[in-house]
Amino acid sequence: MLSTDILERKPRLRAIAALVPEDCQCLADIGTDHGYLPAALLRAGRCRRAIAADIGAAPLERARQTARLYGLEDRMELRLGG
């Protein structure tokens, strides 16, 4: 079970997070938008690091804000591109 509140109101993302193995070394979230999925998994200790990618600069900026909010800048790599 995910021990974080980030996904509390996001049932679709909770379902995806449940499929990630406990010993995930690196998660790639393509189309990350706000970066909630990688942030939740990093905070819960389910993944060591994550790559959050999006084709839009605005969504990636939201992911950057999420990473900053939770102090994950050193473990959540952000990539812009398609």
Model regions and ranges:
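Conserved SAM-binding motif I beta-strand of class I
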Residues: R49-D54
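A structural micro-motif
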Residues: Q25, G45-R48, D74-M76
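Conserved SAM-binding loop of SAM-dependent methyltransferases across substrates and taxa
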Residues: H34-C47
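Conserved SAM/SAH-binding beta-strand->alpha-helix loop
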Residues: G56-A58
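Conserved class I S-adenosyl-L-methionine
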Residues: C24-D33
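S-adenosyl-L-methionine
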Residues: M1-Q25, A39, R64-G82
